[in-house]
């Protein structure tokens, strides 16, 4: 868990007095780094009695084309602007360029938040 509330120090370094104790709503979670592999999912309880599906790993992508959408198999992550190391480690995030059996595609969904990987074709 990561605390995402106000810092105990101001930007000049002075101590800030707490307004209240830390609350559960100020906690965050570690990022889900979706990898290429056998499909694995995890459900997480979130606010409002809801659930969020996180993709831990997958090898399937929904590729949108001009004529519709098709299901394709992910072969490799060729580039990832979020972090150069993500491409080396085959981690899929929004905006990543992936190689599929249907061609090169850019990921448009957030796999750690949406529970699936959607992408659009990239013409080279």
Swiss-Prot record:
Residues 1-22 have a biased composition (Basic residues). InterPro entries: Ribosomal_eS8, Ribosomal_eS8_CS, Ribosomal_protein_eS8_arc, Ribosomal_Se8/biogenesis_NSA2. Keywords: Ribonucleoprotein, Ribosomal protein. The keyword S-adenosyl-L-methionine does not apply. Residues 1-40, 102-124 are annotated as: Disordered. Pfam families: Ribosomal_S8e. GO terms for molecular function: structural constituent of ribosome. GO terms for biological process: maturation of SSU-rRNA from tricistronic rRNA transcript (SSU-rRNA, 5.8S rRNA, LSU-rRNA); translation. GO terms for cellular component: cytosolic small ribosomal subunit. Residues 106-124 have a biased composition (Polar residues). Residues 23-32 have a biased composition (Basic and acidic residues). It comes from the Archaea. Part of the 30S ribosomal subunit. Belongs to the eukaryotic ribosomal protein eS8 family. PANTHER family: 40S RIBOSOMAL PROTEIN S8. This is Small ribosomal subunit protein eS8. It comes from Halobacterium salinarum (strain ATCC 700922 / JCM 11081 / NRC-1). The gene is rps8e.
